[in-house]
Amino acid sequence: MVVKIGIVKVGNIGTSVLIDMILDERADREDIDVRTISSGAKMGKNQMDDVLPKIDEYNPDVIIFISPDPGAKSPSSARETLSKKNIPTIVIGDGPGERAIGSMKEQGLGYIIVKADSMIGARREFLDATEMAVFNSDVLMVLSTTGVFRLIHKTLDKVIRDIDEDKLYSLPELVITAENAVDAADFKNPYAKSKAIAAYSIACQVSSMNVRACFKTKDYHVYIPLVSAAHEMMSAASKLAYEAREIEKSNDTVVRTAHRRNGSILYGTSLNDNKE
């Protein structure tokens, strides 16, 4: 069986950029087929009304819905629509999505909340396309190196495998913290693990600062330093994450979990260990 995965991206968080790619990093898995539909940067009602019906044309076996703040008005409306499709659906969101956990459970939806996938400093005077790209590259460094992406793909792989084998599946109810992220990263060096925990924890704090700057402060002289400081924090988190991986590389203990063609995992802990 080939499991058909429909991914609906509404708006953008850091995880959105690579959510489809982390399931099939070399584009050679034979057990899945993926289609991604995106609303682009916007996440209003018009975008929802246009995007959601298109996923039905693909007839997926499982749906992944990813957006900022799944509890916000438009994503909440989309969740309500998806919950009625009788298709296993997993919602992926950032930290504010924790407030929607209760309603997602009631709707029978799975969820993965990535607390370190923090809101960007979206003030026009500060955020241009270059700054946006730099911020997202820092976020991706944190999410990839601290173990977030590995934890996500392992979680989704289990659902895919259960559907493929026609087993009784359970949808994930996962809030990603520094601790369970670095456990998935499987650091061998304690200093590398400590740096990764620090990176994730700093990244989590970025969102509250940007929320204050973007929604709770009107004074230019207050909110510009706040968004700039928040981006500096994410940059610092990225550097710590990079340093954590460099420590593991220097000890030849970087853990790799590559997908085989059949979707199973090829596990290696030394650069020369990854042999089929």
UniProtKB/Swiss-Prot annotation:
EC class of the enzyme, as a word: oxidoreductase
EC number: 1.5.98.1
Gene3D superfamilies: 6.10.140.120, F420-dependent methylenetetrahydromethanopterin dehydrogenase (MTD)
The reaction(s) this protein catalyses: 5,10-methylenetetrahydromethanopterin + oxidized coenzyme F420-(gamma-L-Glu)(n) + 2 H(+) = 5,10-methenyl-5,6,7,8-tetrahydromethanopterin + reduced coenzyme F420-(gamma-L-Glu)(n)
Listed InterPro entries: MTD, MTD_sf
Source organism, top-level taxon: Archaea
Biological process terms in GO annotation: methanogenesis, from carbon dioxide; one-carbon metabolic process
Keywords (A to Z) from UniProt: One-carbon metabolism, Oxidoreductase
A GO MF label: ferredoxin hydrogenase activity
Record bears the keyword Oxidoreductase: yes
Function: Catalyzes the oxidation of methylene-H(4)MPT to methenyl-H(4)MPT(+).
Family: Belongs to the MTD family.
Name of this chain's protein: F420-dependent methylenetetrahydromethanopterin dehydrogenase
Lineage of the organism: Archaea, Methanobacteriati, Methanobacteriota, Methanomada group, Methanobacteria
